[in-house]
Amino acid sequence: MHIGAERIEAKACVVASGGFESDIAWQREAWGQNEAGEWPADNFLIRGTRFNLGLPLKSLMAAGADTIGDPTQAHCVAIDARAPLYDGGICTRVDCVSLGVMLNSKAERFYDEGEDFWPKRYALWGRLVALQQGQIGHCVIDAKAVGRFMPPVFPGIKTNTLPELARAMGLDESKFMQTIQTYNAACRVGTFDHAVLDDCHTEGLTPAKTHWARKIETAPFYAYPVRPGITFTYLGTRVNRDARMLMKGGGPSANMFAAGEIMAGNVLGKGYAAGIGMTIGSVFGRVAGREAAKNARN
């Protein structure tokens, strides 16, 4: 390895440099254009530093390291569309999706907001929004939801009537009202409990809302515009059980190991559940460190 004019040699190396989430051009190439002629990655926001460009991953790929994972798959969260391009952090995450409805730019629902507990689904919504026209979503709640979720740094758009809310969001008012009224009519009364998979659900509605479905009818009303927020990407180096990198053709590297997000694709294909990233880093950090030290001694 070279640092300026200095050359550093090692008997073994552990690469733990993360993904390529900050390289918008790479994201753009991976995602390509959608049917509407849009480049979805142009509307992605990066939750962390602007410097995670995947340079070590690129170098390893060029040197013959095998890869694993879909370059479009990532830990991708629905975050406030008003967040900065980089470094918005966790405070921009919108956590009220399961308490309301999520609409696209056509004022249509497009997925079950109550499918499962939030820690199992929060990193799904960014990708779902990325697949919508304009890569924009609108999370709509009413006064009943206030105080039941971690409030993001940006306040919700607040109005006293639903038509006012539609206009404030820039959505077609008649279509918005039709969507909300249809949803409200489909809600079945149950015992609301956000801590369990409760029996508040919809009937005869596509897509269904299977839990925590309550009518949006109590003023004031709130909306949060959201965009895809990329935390880390899943494309990475292929490794064996000892965290040793595998080369194209299947053979093991002589002295290269990987840990953390740069090899997360070995574990994560799509989707996410809270804490898996830290678990991958912790487990494979220990494995890679142990095996690299053993390799160097031998």
Name every feature range the model reports, one short phrase each.
Residues A25-E29, P151, V267-Y272:
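Short acidic, glycine/proline-rich loop/turn micro-motifs
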Residues H2-A12, G251-S253:
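Core beta-strand elements of the Rossmann-like FAD/NAD(P) dinucleotide-binding domain
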Residues I8-D80, V287:
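Glycine-rich loop(s) and the adjacent beta-strand/alpha-helix scaffold that form part
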Residues D95-V97, T231-T233, A274:
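Short, small/polar residue-rich loop motifs at catalytic or cofactor-binding pockets
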Residues M177-N266, K270:
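A glycine-rich dinucleotide-binding beta-alpha-beta segment and adjacent secondary-structure elements
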Residues P56-A63, G277-N295:
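An active-site-proximal "capping" alpha-helix that borders the catalytic cofactor pocket
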Residues L53, L57-M177:
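An anion/pyrophosphate-binding glycine-rich loop and adjacent beta-alpha core
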